[in-house]
C-alpha cells in the first residue's frame, strides 16, 4: 500500500518502485515505528482527532503487531510495501479497518522516520556502550593477570623501552574509555524528539510536543521543524564514533597479529578464534583479528559516504536522506560485532612470558637508562645521549647487551660510569623508575588497574 497516490494518474514503473522502495532495509525500524505510532495516537486524543475508545483500539492492535514483529521480523520482507511506515499502516488497517486510516493525521513520514531512526539509535548506543564496557573489563582482567609479563615497547616497530603486557592492555582501556565518552555525548545530543514537526513546517494540530517526547522516552522535543526533519547530525556523529572506535580496534588487532606472529611469538591465540590453511597443515591464522582490522575500512567508508550525501542538500527533507540507514546499520552492526569478537580473543589468549622477557632484553631497550644514569652524574643530557649511542655501537660490535659490557669498556666513553651502573640497566630497574602517573612501574600499573576496576565496577 502506497501512502500517496491521489495526485498520480499512472502507476509507478516497477523498476522505479524497486529503486525507490526502502522496506528491504528500513524494516529494522518496525518496532520503533509501532512505538512511535502508539505515542502519536495518544497525542491525537488530546486534540480531539481520536476518541479514547478509538485510541485504545489502535493501541491494542499496534501492540499485537509489535509482538508479531518481535516473533518474526523477517515476515516484513515478504511484503511489497514501499517502506516500514506503509507496512505498519497497512497491517494496522487490516486489523482495525477504516479506523487505522486516521492515525496518520497531522503526521508526515518525514518526522516519523526521523523519530524512528533516533529511537533506534538510542537503543543501539546502549548496546554499544555495554559491549564497550565488556571489552574494557576483559582488558582489565587480562592486565591483572599479566602485570609481571615484561615485553618490549615499540616505536617505529623498533624495540624502544621495556613495558609490561598489562600496561599495553591498559592503553587500550584508555582508548575504549574515550569511545565510551563519545557515545555518551552523542546520546545526549540525539535525545530530542522530532515527532510533531510534520513534513517541514510543523503540525497544524496543537499537540504538546514536550509531552509527546516524554512518552517516547526523549528528554525534550526539538525546537525547529525545518531542522528537525532534515537533521542527520546524529547519524554523522554515530558514524564518526564508530570510525574512531574501529580505528582503535584495528590497532588492537594489528598489535596482537604481530605479537602472535612467529617473528614475535609473544602470545598465542585460542583455537576458538583462529583458523587453518587448506594447503598448509601447520598454519594457525589469526582470522578474527584480521577481520576486525579489515572491517575498519567499511566503517570509514560509511562515514565518508554519509558526509558526501548530506553536504549539498537544501532544507528540508530530500529523498537522498533515505541513504542514511544502510551505511549506519552496517557500520554500527560491524562495530558491535568487532567489540564482541575482540573480547572473545582476549578470553583465551596466552602470554608467553619468557619469550616476552627475552625480547625485552634485546635491542638495547635499556639505553635510555644509561643516559639517565649519566645525567644523574652531572652529564648534560644531549652529551649523555651521544655517549650512550657510542656505547651501543660498541656493544653491537661485541655482540653483547649493554649490561654485559665490562666496566673498563663502558668507562672508555665516560669516566663517570661506575659499578653502580649495572643494577640501573636491569629490566626491573627500567620499569621501577617509570613511577610518575601513567608510567609503566609496577606500582603505577597496579594503581591504574585499581582505578579502572573501580570505574567499571568490577
From Swiss-Prot:
This is Argininosuccinate lyase. It is an enzyme of class 4 (lyase). PANTHER family: ARGININOSUCCINATE LYASE. It catalyses: 2-(N(omega)-L-arginino)succinate = fumarate + L-arginine. Belongs to the lyase 1 family. Argininosuccinate lyase subfamily. Keywords: Amino-acid biosynthesis, Arginine biosynthesis, Cytoplasm, Lyase. The keyword Ribosomal protein does not apply. GO terms for biological process: arginine biosynthetic process via ornithine; L-arginine biosynthetic process. Pathway: Amino-acid biosynthesis; L-arginine biosynthesis; L-arginine from L-ornithine and carbamoyl phosphate: step 3/3. Its EC number is 4.3.2.1. The gene is argH. GO terms for cellular component: cytosol. HAMAP family: Arg_succ_lyase (MF_00006). It is found in: Cytoplasm. GO terms for molecular function: argininosuccinate lyase activity. It comes from Salmonella schwarzengrund (strain CVM19633). It holds the Pfam family ASL_C2.
Amino acid at each position: 500500500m502506497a501512502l500517496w497516490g491521489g495526485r498520480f494518474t499512472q502507476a509507478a514503473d516497477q523498476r522505479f518502485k524497486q529503486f525507490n522502495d526502502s522496506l528491504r532495509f528500513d524494516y529494522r525500524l518496525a518496532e520503533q515505528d509501532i512505538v512511535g505510532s502508539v505515542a502519536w495516537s495518544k497525542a491525537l486524543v488530546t486534540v480531539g482527532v481520536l476518541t479514547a475508545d478509538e485510541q485504545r483500539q489502535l493501541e491494542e492492535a499496534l501492540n499485537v503487531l509489535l509482538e508479531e514483529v518481535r516473533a518474526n521480523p523477517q515476515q516484513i520482507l515478504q511484503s511489497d510495501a514501499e517502506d516500514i511506515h506503509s507496512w505498519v499502516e497497512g497491517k494496522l488497517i487490516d486489523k482495525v479497518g477504516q479506523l487505522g486510516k486516521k492515525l496518520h493525521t497531522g503526521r508526515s513520514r518525514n518526522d516519523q522516520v526521523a523519530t524512528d531512526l533516533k529511537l533506534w539509535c538510542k537503543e543501539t548506543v546502549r548496546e554499544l556502550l555495554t559491549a564497550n564496557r565488556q571489552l574494557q573489563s576483559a582488558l582489565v582482567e587480562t592486565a591483572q593477570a599479566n602485570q609481571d609479563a615484561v615485553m618490549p615497547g615499540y616505536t617505529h616497530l623498533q624495540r624502544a623501552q621495556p613495558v609490561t603486557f598489562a600496561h599495553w592492555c591498559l592503553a587500550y582501556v584508555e582508548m575504549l574509555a574515550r569511545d565510551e565518552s563519545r557515545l555518551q555525548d552523542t546520546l545526549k545530543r540525539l535525545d530530542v524528539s522530532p515527532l510533531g514537526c510534520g513534513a517541514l513546517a510543523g503540525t497544524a494540530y496543537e499537540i504538546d510536543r514536550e509531552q509527546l517526547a516524554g512518552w517516547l522516552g526523549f528528554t525534550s522535543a526539538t525546537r525547529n521543524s525545518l531542522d528537525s526533519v532534515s537533521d542527520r547530525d546524529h547519524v554523522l556523529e554515530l558514524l564518526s564514533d564508530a570510525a574512531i572506535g574501529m580505528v582503535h580496534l584495528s590497532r588492537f588487532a594489528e598489535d596482537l597479529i604481530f605479537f602472535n606472529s612467529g617473528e614475535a611469538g609473544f602470545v598465542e591465540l585460542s583455537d576458538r578464534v583462529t583458523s587453518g590453511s587448506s594447503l598448509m597443515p601447520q598454519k594457525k591464522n589469526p582470522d578474527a583479528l584480521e577481520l576486525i582490522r579489515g572491517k575498519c575500512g567499511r566503517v570509514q567508508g560509511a562515514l565518508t559516504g554519509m558526509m558526501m550525501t548530506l553536504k549539498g542538500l537544501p532544507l528540508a527533507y530530500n529523498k537522498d536522506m533515505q541513504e542514511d540507514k544502510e551505511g549506519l546499520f552496517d557500520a554500527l552492526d560491524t562495530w558491535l560485532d568487532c567489540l564482541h569478537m575482540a573480547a572473545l580473543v582476549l578470553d583465551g589468549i596466552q602470554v608467553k612470558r619468557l619469550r616476552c622477557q627475552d625480547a625485552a632484553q634485546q635491542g638495547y631497550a635499556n639505553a635510555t637508562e644509561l643516559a639517565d644514569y649519566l645525567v644523574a652524574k652531572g652529564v648534560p643530557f644531549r652529551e649523555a645521549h651521544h655517549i650512550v649511542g657510542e656505547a651501543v655501537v660498541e656493544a653491537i660490535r661485541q655482540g653483547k647487551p649493554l649490561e654485559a659490557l665490562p666496566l673498563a669498556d663502558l668507562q672508555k666513553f665516560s669516566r663517570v660510569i661506575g659499578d653502580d651502573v649495572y643494577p640501573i640497566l636491569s629490566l626491573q630497574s627500567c620499569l621501577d623508575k617509570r613511577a610518575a602517573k601513567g608510567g609503566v612501574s609496577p606500582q603505577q600499573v597496579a594503581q591504574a588497574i585499581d582505578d579502572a576496576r573501580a570505574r567499571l565496577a568490577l
